[in-house]
Every structure is written in structure tokens, then in C-alpha cells.
Amino acid sequence: MSVQELSHPLIKDGWFREINNMWPGQAMTLKVKKVLYAGKSKYQDVLVFESETYGHVLVLDGAIQATERDEFSYQEMIAHLALNSHPNPKKVLVIGGGDGGVLREVVKHECVEEAILCDIDEDVIKVSKQYLPEMSAGFNHPKVKVHIGDGFKFLQDYQNTFDVIITDSSDPDGPAEALFQKPYFQLLSDALRGGGVITTQAECMWIHLGVISNVLTAVKTVFPNVRYAYTTIPTYPSGSIGFVVASKDASIDLSKPLRKWSPEEENKLCKYYNSEIHAASFVLPTFARDVVDKATSS
């Protein structure tokens, strides 16, 4: 099926343009080889296309969520920064992450006994299973359970249950807005066991320092141990995205993994993450460090 036969308003002259108010004055463009899916779920616009250079691309409400070429740098970091900051994570919850990529990373940890994913949009899961098989492979693992529903409401039913909770959300200008505010972080804390760890998607230091500061301030009112890390990823705005990493254990250094794979295991399991980059991801440029330090100091 050609671009002309199945298209989308953001694709013009064979190019996808990521124009969004969250990053005004700039846009990522990718050359489109073939539109694979274009539709609207109950919650958002869903687009999948085959690009010339980045493989299959998942786009929600006009914003790139994942591409086959670079998705691993995000999925690995948001998962392993949290999981390797916990001494023995057995029960893990993923909020969002309907493409399955974070689940794929979670089940690489043999100590994990159960991984639950809660995503509000079943269509994203269905589309990902069809068009993003390498990412959605996580859904096939026997340790995985899937719940379709609102993550905020899901958490209200759980107390002292999970060792690690990973929030793989879209940007805070749509259905994920509530996942960037203090009441949500309180629910996360309540749902964690002692020593529990969270990671959450926390935007880009180059264009969202105000958002990052507000999120860190909110998390710090709930968790005693809060840090900010980042990864590089070409198809996200300005080429990087950050994570809030927080623990209920005030004594641990989140920049130093409590558990490590051997170098051989790391090379086999991961394309981006390793124990050295775990530590390095918390080292911030001065302009960002100053904002982060101010938001997390108490």
C-alpha cells in the first residue's frame, strides 16, 4: 500500500513532520516509505509507518513514541536504571508502555517473578503486536500479565505490593498529564514495598527544564531519594530524554547499580545499557545540573 493509498495529515510530500506545541519552533522529519496503520483510538491518534532509515515508527497524537532503529536506548535505560537499583526486584509494574518494549527489558532479569503492564489504550498494544514485533515480544513472556485501564486508578487498589514501578508515559499534554503530578507519585510510593524504586519518563533537558523542575519537586515531596538521568536517542526532541529515578531507601546511591550483569551478559542482553553508562547517565551538564539540584535539595 503506497503513501498515497493510506496517508496521514502529518505526512506531506513523502515526509512525516513531528510538529508539536511541546517543542515549539522545531520539528523532527522522517522520510516515509510506507504507511502501515493510521487510525484513532478512544484516546489518541495512532500512526505507524515504515521509514526510509529508522524502520517502523510508532506515532501517538503526532509525537514519535518509538522507532525500530533507536528504541532500545530508551527502553533499556528506563527499565534497567530502576531494576538494577533494587537488590532483588521480584514484582514489577509498568504503567503505559503499550508497545511492549519496557516489558521486554523487565523480563531479562531472572529475579523478576511477575511483570504487570497497565495501559489505558488497548489499540496501541494491538497495533504494536502487529507492526512492532521486536518491541512487543515482551507480551509473550509467561511472567507477564496485562491490564487494560487507567494507571492512576489501577494503583489505587494496591498497597505495599511492587518492588519496582516504571512509568513509560507519553508527554504531559494529553492523556498522561496526571502521571506527572504529586498525587500520582504518592500512589506510586504507597504501592511500593520498602526499598522500592521508580523510574518515570521525564522529558528533555534542552527544552523542558521547567517541566523537569516541577516533576522533580513533586517527586521529592514523596520520595526521600530522587535523581535525574538521561539517555540519547536521535528521534526524540533534541536527541535526548530524561528519567526521574527515585527510591524509598534514602541510603542508596542510585547512580551506582546494586546489581550488575557480567560484561558478557550485558553484551548479550543490551545494546545501550551497561553498568558504566548507568553511572554516567546521572552526570548532567551544568545548566541542567543546577536546575535539578535546586529541585531535589531539601
Swiss-Prot record:
A biological process from GO: spermidine biosynthetic process
SUPFAM superfamilies referenced in this protein's UniProt entry, alphabetically: S-adenosyl-L-methionine-dependent methyltransferases
Ligand binding (S-adenosyl 3-(methylsulfanyl)propylamine): 44, 75, 99, 119, 150-151, 168
Sorted UniProt keywords: Polyamine biosynthesis, Spermidine biosynthesis, Transferase
GO CC terms of this entry: cytosol; nucleus
Residue numbers annotated as active site: 168 (proton acceptor)
Record field: catalytic activity: S-adenosyl 3-(methylsulfanyl)propylamine + putrescine = S-methyl-5'-thioadenosine + spermidine + H(+)
Any one Pfam family match given in the protein's UniProt record, by short name: Spermine_synth
Annotated binding of putrescine, by residue: 74, 168-171, 236
Molecular function as annotated in GO: spermidine synthase activity
Statement: the UniProt record of this protein carries the keyword Chaperone: no
Domain PABS residues, every copy: 13-248
InterPro entries tied to this protein: PABS, PABS_CS, SAM-dependent_MTases_sf, Spermi_synthase, Spermi_synthase_euk, Spermidine_synt_N, Spermidine_synt_N_sf
EC class name: transferase
Pathways involved: Amine and polyamine biosynthesis; spermidine biosynthesis; spermidine from putrescine: step 1/1
Enzyme Commission designation: 2.5.1.16
Family: Belongs to the spermidine/spermine synthase family.
Protein name per UniProt: Spermidine synthase
The organism of origin for this protein: Schizosaccharomyces pombe (strain 972 / ATCC 24843) (Fission yeast)
Taxonomic lineage: Eukaryota, Fungi, Dikarya, Ascomycota, Taphrinomycotina
